[in-house]
C-alpha cells in the first residue's frame, strides 16, 4: 500500500482534506494517509522526512514558517523524496497581491476551517428544526424562536445559524397546543417574536398574491390576525423567563443583533 504523509505545523486536518479531495479523482486507489502534525523545528522536520523516505512515500506539507518550508524542500531533495508544498506558493502570491507579508502563525487556517464547519453544523441543525420540525431536538438548540406564521422566524433562524448558533423555531397557531417539548426548554434560550397586526396582514397578503391564492383567505384577515397576536401575547405572559422582541419595524439583522445583545450573558458575537 502506498502512503501519503501530510506534514503540518498545526493539526494537518485541512491539508489532509485537500489530499483526499485530489485522491477522489483516482478512483479506488489503495493509499493510506498518515498525518505528521505539530512539526515545529528543523530536528522534527529531519525526522519526518526520514520516516517518509523509509516508506518511499509522498510528502505533502503545509508550513507557515517559511524557514521550515525551505528546510523540508532542501532535505527532501537530498533524500530524493517526492514532496509537495501546498501553502507556500499561495502565501507568496497573496503577499504580492495584498502588498503585505503573512503572519506566519501556525493554526490560523485550522481555526478558520473549524469556524466554517461549526457554522455548517449550525445551519444543518436549523434547517432540520425549522417551523416545528423535529421537536424532540429542541433541547439541543442554542436558541428557540417562537411566533405566529410570517413573523420572520425562518429568516431570523437562518441568519443566526450562519453566525454559528443552532436555532429551532416553533410556530404558534391559535387552537393548536404548542409542543410539550417547548415547556422543557431553558427559558433563557427562548425568544418570543411579536409583530403588529397591520404589518402581518401586509406580509401575508403579499404572500397570498405571490402564491396566486384568493385574497378572501382568512390567513390575511385583519380580525383573525388580531386574534392570533392576542393569543400570542397571552401565551408569552405565561412564560416570563422568555425574551420577547417586536420585529415589526426591524430588519432580520437588527432583530438578530438585539437577540444576541440582550442574551450577552450566554452568547458573544
Swiss-Prot record:
Catalytic reactions on record: N(tele)-phospho-L-histidyl/L-threonyl-[pyruvate, phosphate dikinase] + ADP = N(tele)-phospho-L-histidyl/O-phospho-L-threonyl-[pyruvate, phosphate dikinase] + AMP + H(+); N(tele)-phospho-L-histidyl/O-phospho-L-threonyl-[pyruvate, phosphate dikinase] + phosphate + H(+) = N(tele)-phospho-L-histidyl/L-threonyl-[pyruvate, phosphate dikinase] + diphosphate
Transmembrane feature ranges: none
Enzyme class: transferase
EC number, as in UniProt: 2.7.11.32, 2.7.4.27
Keywords (A to Z) from UniProt: Kinase, Nucleotide-binding, Serine/threonine-protein kinase, Transferase
Domain of life: Bacteria
Any one GO molecular-function label of the UniProt entry: ATP binding
Entry annotated with the keyword Nucleotide-binding: yes
The protein's role, per its UniProt record: Bifunctional serine/threonine kinase and phosphorylase involved in the regulation of the pyruvate, phosphate dikinase (PPDK) by catalyzing its phosphorylation/dephosphorylation.
Stored PANTHER family: PYRUVATE, PHOSPHATE DIKINASE REGULATORY PROTEIN 1, CHLOROPLASTIC
NCBIfam families: PRK05339.1
Name used for this protein in its record: Putative pyruvate, phosphate dikinase regulatory protein
Lineage of the species this protein comes from: Bacteria, Pseudomonadati, Thermodesulfobacteriota, Desulfuromonadia, Geobacterales
